[in-house]
Amino acid sequence: MKPTRKALLTCLLCTPMIVAAQTEEPASDNAGKSNKEEGNRNVMLNASSANGPREIQIGLPSTDVNVLENGLPVTFATNPHSVNSNWRMDASHSHVGLLKISETAITTGNIGYAVNSWTKLGEKGFHGSLNYKTNHFGMQEFSLNVNGSLANNWLYSANVYQDFDPGTFDIKSSKLQDRTQIYKLALTRLYGNGRGQFSAMYHYSNSHPVSNYATQSAPFIYVGDGSVKEYGKFKLGTTSYLPVDANMTYRDMRTGEIGNISLYDAAENRSSQVYLSNKYAWDNGLTWTASARYDHARGAFVYQTPMSLTYVKDNPAYNYKTINALGQRENYTGDYVQSRMSCLNAGDIDELLFTTELSKKFSRSTLRVGFNEWLYNIDYASNTTMYDQSVAADGSYPVRVYDANKRDYYFYDFNKNASEYYKGTENKLAAYLTHDWDITDKLNAYYGARIEWQRLNGENAAVRNAAGDYVGRFSDYHLGATAADGTVIRPVDLNYNWVNYDLTAALTYKINRQFGLTGDFTYIVQHPRFENFSPATLPNTQKITVPLGRAGFYYNNKWLSLTSLFSYISKTNNNSTLNLQHGAEIMAAPMSYDIQTWGWTTDAIIRPFKGFELHALFTYQKPTYKKYETSVTFSDGYTGSINATGNIVAEIPQVLIELDPSYMITPDLKLWTSFRYFSKTYANINDAYYFNGRWESFGGVDWKVNKMLNLGCTVVNFLNQTGAKGSIAGAELITKEDAGNYSNCLMTGSYLRPLTVEFTAKLNF
């Protein structure tokens, strides 16, 4: 498993979710907010990204991002084809909302909330929308949609999205940290008497998400009290930690051939999609919808993961050199050397997704039955390469270095660490049912069930030797290679069939017009995804269970809307692979563990006087590891062990606060701010390192100039907080007892997004 990006925020429950910023009213398509969706989620205010929705992690490890477009997942799996490379919230959308956990579970089988987006499919007449966004670092983002009538009952919609983002610091390996382009063209035929419509759409995207690896890590001094200091003139968030050289040498996992590629080209994602949808409504309240999409794609996700950080100054055990522009070898005179693992994840993908629903409205209820047939075919490999680089205290660009005592060039240990391979199909065939029932004027019940057949068929490289033990990865590993014990690396066949199911039920009782009680329970049963079979060992194939329950009350009056809930969530058999480090050696440690979280959340919207609104949210949670034990033995005989059972889950705060005040100065001018507090988070699994609590801050002005033009200005991190977050590279084996030995030491990890001023304009015509 590769590292994941995490922005640790919160909302109402203890489960992961990604949410979109705003909700627009639908045009002629079948979008629209309903009681399937949550409201009040202003989360395109992303402290980690300038162009994507933030991830909200509450109590469970990150899993696939749940984003739907036109009723279907944007991508079946996010590694190697990430959502942000294929989807942006732009002028092409008529509606963007957030599905509830229960709705996501029943309709997709996934855990957590889901972004629910719908494409503009055209309206009668002519309509246009142009969105523009820039920031003081030079980002340029454009989105144009035009739609209207072609002929009687024929509509069209066309959209262009372009993003040119240089990031918050210059890098030498490419001019931009995000270059994404998305094109959509849709034709719609309206049925007579307003009964529905049939639509066909073509979607093409091309994306180079360089920021995934360009912003992955940076050096800082860990003081020892939860705070960090900058290392010399290296400024977190505005100084590059990528080497100058753009090219990477690797060994192909499939063929064993040595290849060279630029990081920019390695990160390229392409997608060509054909989408069909149909909606038809009868007079008796019966409605039929169907959506289908075929996607032919190349997905890619590149990591440049920091590993060991070594002090080499005046140490005769090391003889580091670099090669200058003239090809001459020079001695490296710096203090530190950072080793990095380059992971070039890529796969050719074909997806065929189909969902259909039949719903019937009765006087006091709505009954719905649905069907999914989702087929995912992939040929995937992750080619990994190790290299070393300088750590420049003067803030200059790093350069690659090599230890002349061990090798004569930069790259080494091809595919030894975390290389991956799998090929084949994953198929999910599911049926589901929901019933939303107003039993009385005061009592509402919502319940549903899903049953799913999941089938995996293909091959991977989890190879065993004659004794039945896993061979594991080794230097120059590839299909066809021979291990030290004589085992030939050949693909291993996979064939699994599982039955998954999900159950959900919710009750809301209105005691009076202002006060009521609410509770819900969702139970999800899953099995491993195809991507879990990518490492050198097979995952735990036992069922994964996720029970989620919450109960509380709500209160509403003219100036206050309040909800307070207690919640519980747990998850069994999380499959993960740790890359454990001892000295300069790295070993992969596959494992399966459980996790549970108790939580309490209070969410309030307060409107004390005209024009002013305050959204306030407080969450206390306690996410803990269960059955979290693993160990590996290194080549020198040292055994590295981890027993994190009972520890607080790394990178997840126990206290979270959100404060979002806004004031309408005039009916057309809005002033707003947003503050988010994250309490202390642990930076490694053993809870040895930690980062102190921090505030994220946003503020801005929105101005509706006239009915055609809207302008906005947003300041990200206006408190100008700097520092580290997330995890510390190479620290998994450090214990609480050892942590005191690492005070005021140089380390690497992720960091806060720097102060950024953004400007937006939206023109409707």
Where are these regions (language model features)?
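Outer-membrane beta-barrel proteins
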Residues: 133-141, 163-193, 210-212, 247-279, ...
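Outer-membrane beta-barrel translocator/receptor signature
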Residues: 78, 91-95, 104-183, 191-198, ...
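C-terminal beta-signal and adjacent terminal beta-strands/loops
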Residues: 22-24, 680-682, 701-765
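Acidic, small-polar-rich N-terminal luminal/periplasmic segments of exported/outer-membrane proteins
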Residues: 22-125, 524
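Structural signature of Gram-negative outer-membrane beta-barrels, strongest in the C-terminal barrel
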Residues: 347-351, 361-407, 411-572, 598, ...
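Repeated loop/turn-to-beta-strand initiation elements of outer-membrane beta-barrel proteins
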Residues: 126-127, 153-156, 193-198, 285-288, ...
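Gram-negative outer-membrane beta-barrel transporters
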Residues: 441-442, 559-561, 567-572, 590-685, ...
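Acidic/polar loop-and-plug regions of large Gram-negative outer-membrane beta-barrel proteins
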Residues: 175, 183, 188-190, 197-275, ...
